[in-house]
Structure formats: structure tokens, C-alpha cells
Design a protein with these regions (language model features):
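Non-catalytic, mostly N-terminal accessory regions of nucleic-acid modification and defense proteins
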Residues: 1-220
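Conserved S-adenosyl-L-methionine
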Residues: 198-250
Length: 250
């Protein structure tokens, strides 16, 4: 999965580079957001196929997302009511398959951006960041506006969709996988090699964070209601490692 992750990062980077965004802060935002969208899509499908009411219908279909496209609004709401609170919600028109099949239509960039914003709004209660002023910041924002030439935005959107279409997260849902650290480390290496700089020189690599987490948690297996606080958190790699070591349910 690590090799597949890096391959996908490089694929997305080839797209951002082709549209003049290589080595920019926008590139990191685009790569992480497309990763997260694909993660949401695959996680939703993975859990929906295990739903006690509709799971059999979806899992027996040749393509679960094509079958999901046939759901009525009532069936969609019913499915949502059975899914765990921690699972992202996607409407039929939000799935990657539905979007991918719409790529030949005009103004696809607007459709992709609107879909990402709609998913963020639908999942704002569970998946958002709260600022110190108690304002909520959504997890998805329009992506194609980073391309200044409006005539090229549709092709940019199509290219991003082609990049993520072949990647599958379902193999990692039964284990713990911090893909953000892979993205950050791989992009960071590229930035530093290209510019000769020392970006994020105080960043803690994922392997080191895992060792730190094991040392901090120790052999204590009777932990309950744990809260972790890292005042200097950047990518959250140490917090993720601690959560995995302790157990998210604790």
C-alpha cells in the first residue's frame, strides 16, 4: 500500500506539474484533498456493503456505486441511519464513479468543485476542524480554481479524477494507515530536492512517531477516555501514532 500511495502521489504531482502548480502550497492541498475524497468514497462503499439493510444488495451488485445510483432518496436516508457516526456520508451523485461518468459533460470542473463542497457540508458535523473561535472549517474546498486559466480547468479536473480512479483504499480499512504522513514526507522530499531548502526541518518522520508512541503508551492496556494533546502538532503524525497505539475506541 505504501508503494501504491507513492505512485498515486507522483501521478497527482504529474497533473499539478502539467498545469503549472508544481512545488506550490496549492499542490499539497490538491494532493491531500483528492486523497481524502478517494478515502471517503472507498470508506463509504466499504461500510455500505456491510449495512444490515442494504449491504447485500450493494455487495452482490457488479459495481456497488452503480447500484447505489438507483437508490431512492428514502433508501439513501435509511442507509445513512444505519451507518456508524464515524463513517462519511455520500449521496449517489457524490461517488467517484458517478463523477467519473460525468467527466464528458461540459463544465466538469464546476461539477467537481461543487461536489467536494457539498460533501464537506453534508459531513460538517463529524468531519470538520474547529478553530479557537469555535468556527468550523470544512475539509473540502474548490480545487480547480488554483488553475488560473479557466479554459484549462475542465481538463485539470478530468486528469485528477483519472489519477485517483485506479487506487483502492479498501485493503487498508482493517488496519491503521496514516496516508497524510506519506503524502507530506514524499512531497517534502521533492520540495527540498528541487529547491535545496530545508522545509519542515522539525517534522517528525512517521517511523520515529511510531516509536515515540510506543514509548509514551508503554505496556498499559487498561486506558480509558484518553485525550492526547500536542501543542506543536503540524501534520498530526504523532497524534495519529498515539491514537493507533492506544486504540481509537479508548
Amino acid at each position: 500500500i505504501s508503494e501504491a500511495t507513492i505512485a498515486l502521489i507522483d501521478s497527482l504531482k504529474s497533473t499539478t506539474g502539467a498545469f503549472g502548480l508544481a512545488g506550490t502550497g496549492s499542490e499539497y492541498k490538491i494532493v491531500t484533498e483528492m486523497f481524502l475524497y478517494k478515502f471517503f468514497n472507498d470508506k463509504f462503499g466499504y461500510e455500505a456493503k456491510r449495512d444490515p439493510m442494504h449491504g447485500e444488495r450493494l455487495s452482490k451488485a457488479e459495481k456497488w456505486d452503480a447500484e447505489y445510483d438507483t437508490f431512492t432518496e428514502e433508501e439513501v436516508e435509511d442507509l445513512f441511519s444505519y451507518l456508524p457516526h464515524s463513517v462519511p456520508r455520500l449521496k449517489p451523485e457524490h461517488t467517484l464513479s458517478h463523477l467519473y461518468n460525468s467527466a464528458t459533460k461540459g463544465d466538469f470542473s464546476t461539477l467537481l468543485d461543487a461536489t467536494l463542497v457539498d460533501i464537506a457540508s453534508l459531513n460538517a458535523e463529524t468531519f470538520s476542524v474547529t478553530t479557537s473561535g469555535k468556527s468550523k472549517v470544512n475539509i473540502f474546498f474548490p480545487l480547480t480554481t488554483y488553475v488560473t486559466d479557466t479554459q484549462k480547468r475542465d481538463e485539470f479536473a478530468k486528469s485528477l479524477m483519472r489519477n485517483v480512479a485506479s487506487f483502492n483504499f479498501e485493503d487498508v480499512f482493517d488496519e491503521k494507515y496514516d496516508f497524510f504522513s506519506h503524502i507530506f514526507e514524499h512531497l517534502l522530499k521533492g520540495f527540498n530536492n528541487a529547491g535545496g531548502g530545508k522545509y519542515a526541518e522539525y517534522y517528525t518522520p512517521r517511523a520515529i512517531a511510531q516509536v515515540m508512541a510506543r514509548l509514551l503508551v508503554g505496556e498499559n492496556t487498561d486506558l480509558r477516555g484518553v485525550t492526547c494533546y500536542d501543542p506543536s502538532a503540524g501534520t498530526g503524525t504523532l497524534l495519529m501514532a498515539l491514537a493507533h497505539q492506544i486504540g481509537e475506541e479508548r
